[in-house]
Regions:
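N-terminal short beta-loop-beta anion/metal-coordinating cradle
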Residues: 1-103
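Conserved active-site and cofactor/substrate-binding residues in soluble primary-metabolism enzymes
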Residues: 18, 31-34, 38, 108, ...
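Short beta-strand segments
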Residues: 24-25, 102-103, 131-133, 192-194
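Flexible, glycine/proline-enriched loop segments at strand-loop-helix junctions
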Residues: 26-30, 101-110, 160-168, 198-202
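Internal, conserved structured core segments that host functional sites
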Residues: 96, 104-155, 176-177
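Catalytic cores of processing enzymes, dominated by hydrolases/peptidases
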Residues: 138-218, 222
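A conserved C-terminal secondary-structure "cap"
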Residues: 199-303
């Protein structure tokens, strides 16, 4: 395998089977509900994880924007934890291998990074590529998390994409990868989760569940979600307790529900996210009332 200056191959990769799915999720862009962060932690915590390729931080990372962690031990620096952008070989719950691209979104050289990933896709004979992102939307937490699907797999768009706007969006590195893969005719799908925007700054377990379900729909891979679902039930119960104690909150959530349901029933409204005048509903009151709950949850130690 010819060496590319943007990455280093870790050991012998000649035994990596061809025809695997590639799953990608990068942090640094919008990650509402910490969906990408949570699934990265879960997938890299699976029993079988083997790093194949490590990308060069000095070429791709802005250290001053995302400073690495240094560990200070009384009177000296004891260790250094740099960011990592890595392609790994992982196994799902049924011990089926797949490729996983995780880490930071490159700050620099997006075209070169895209070419490098496409080179790896060709080298490993990847069958298809699926990537995940999550953005905030004024949708209610009482309804299933919706997704917008992009790419060149129309069966996934038709089955799962509930919002299909014509608009300009701020691009990310995986958008560019998808665009180039489409040009090359490689099967690719991007799933953008529509997370309730008043929960966007939390670690929302059901966002991670929705992300894993999307990956499963695109690839057939199976992942452990029982713990996340249980955390999601506890999280939702706490949110419901906050909402139930405030009439204004109840009214605002009900309004979001009505807009969502009208859209899902093919109401002529152009989107569940706007009213008939095209204005986004305000969630300031929701955010203010939930602030205490969200802050307290962030401070809770994780088991």
């Amino acid at each position: 395998m010819d060496q590319n200056p943007l990455y280093e191959v870790v050991g012998d990769v000649s035994d990596v089977p061809t025809g695997l799915h590639l799953v990608a999720g990068l942090t640094g862009f919008t990650d509402s509900g910490s969906a990408v962060g949570q699934i990265t932690e879960l997938l890299r915590g699976l029993p079988v994880v083997r790093d194949l390729v490590v990308f060069d931080n000095d070429a791709l990372l802005d250290y001053r924007a995302r400073r690495p962690v240094m560990f200070f031990d009384e009177d000296h620096l004891s260790s250094y934890e740099p960011a990592r952008l890595v392609l790994s070989l992982v196994e799902d719950e049924l011990h089926r291998p797949f490729l996983l691209l995780t880490g930071y979104e490159p700050d620099f050289r997006w075209e070169a990074f895209t070419r490098a990933v496409m080179e790896l896709i060709e080298r490993f004979g990847v069958a298809d590529t699926t990537w995940i992102n999550a953005i905030p939307m004024p949708t209610p937490h009482t309804r299933p998390i919706g997704v917008t699907v992009s790419g060149n797999r129309p069966e996934l768009v038709e089955a799962f994409s509930i919002w299909r706007p014509r608009t300009q969006v701020p691009g990310n590195a995986l958008h560019l990868l998808e665009y180039r893969l489409q040009e090359a005719g490689h099967p690719t799908a991007g799933f953008v989760l529509l997370v309730p925007h008043y929960l966007a700054d939390t670690e929302y377990p059901l966002a991670a569940v929705a992300a894993l379900e999307s990956i499963s729909a695109a690839t057939g891979l199976i992942f452990p979600t029982d713990e996340l679902r249980e955390e999601g039930r506890d999280f939702t119960q706490k949110v419901e307790e906050q909402v139930a104690g405030n009439t204004e909150l109840e009214r605002l959530v009900r309004t979001l529900e009505e807009r969502h349901d009208s859209y899902m029933e093919e109401n002529p409204l152009p989107s569940p996210l706007v009213d008939q005048d095209g204005e986004l509903p305000s969630a300031d009151t929701i955010a203010a009332e939930l602030e205490r709950f969200l802050a307290s949850r962030r401070d809770e130690p994780r088991p």
